[in-house]
Amino acid sequence: MKQIFSTLLVVGLFSGSAYAMGPTKKYEACMKQTGNVLSEIDACMSKEYKVQKKRLEKVFKPYLAKAPAEEQGLVKQSHQQWLAQRDQICNNKPIVKNEKTELQRISCLMQMTQTRADMYEARTGRISK
């Protein structure tokens, strides 16, 4: 029984990561060129967030289409609730607003959006390019 569980766990880990697109190559290159300058890091993250946001919209469509017709309303509702939760978590008002808190906000939005898009891709078996 333990061996079956271990096998399923390993298969689950690899199957999820097999489809995960993660950050774009442009983002990785951009971040390497920032020289740890906060304004440049912010610019890279903002661009990547826009890319991941579009990607999320793109991969949600086949994910929704794959759901049974009677469950599509719930899938849409769940997606909208997730968007609201992401925005609430990432856009909380800091006591002091500065470059670092803005970086935290955009990093949160970017990473949560990328992770959700990765999940939709893994569940549909499609990889967006």
PLM regions: where:
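Sec-dependent N-terminal signal peptides
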Residues: I4-S15
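N-terminal alpha-helical modules
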Residues: Y19-K129
